[in-house]
UniProtKB/Swiss-Prot annotation:
This is Large ribosomal subunit protein bL31. The keyword Iron does not apply. NCBIfam families: L31 (TIGR00105), PRK00019.1 (NF000612), PRK00528.1 (NF001809). Zn(2+) binds at residues 16, 18, 36, 39. Binds the 23S rRNA. GO terms for biological process: translation. Binds 1 zinc ion per subunit. It comes from Lachnospira eligens (strain ATCC 27750 / DSM 3376 / VPI C15-48 / C15-B4). Pfam families: Ribosomal_L31. Its cofactor is Zn(2+). Belongs to the bacterial ribosomal protein bL31 family. Type A subfamily. One of its GO terms (cellular component) is ribonucleoprotein complex. It comes from the Bacteria.
Length: 68
């Protein structure tokens, strides 16, 4: 392999907006993220019912689609 062409690899500190921090490998020394597994609704079990159901009903009503 040629020397000097590969980026440096660091033990990067990942910082979330919720305050959670963890370490991973990356070519950057520090990474800032908006959502992590500690605060994401899927992982915390605090998912809210989505409005998708209402949108589907609105579409079906608009175009006369029945659920048969």
């Amino acid at each position: 392999m040629r020397e000097g062409i590969h980026p440096d690899y660091y033990q990067a500190k990942v910082v979330c907006n919720c305050g959670n921090e963890f370490v991973t490998g990356s070519t950057k020394e520090e990474i800032h993220v908006e959502i992590c597994s500690k605060c994401h609704p899927f992982y915390t079990g605090q998912q809210k019912a989505s409005s998708t159901r209402g949108r589907i009903d609105k579409f079906n009503k608009k175009y006369g689609v029945s659920n048969n």
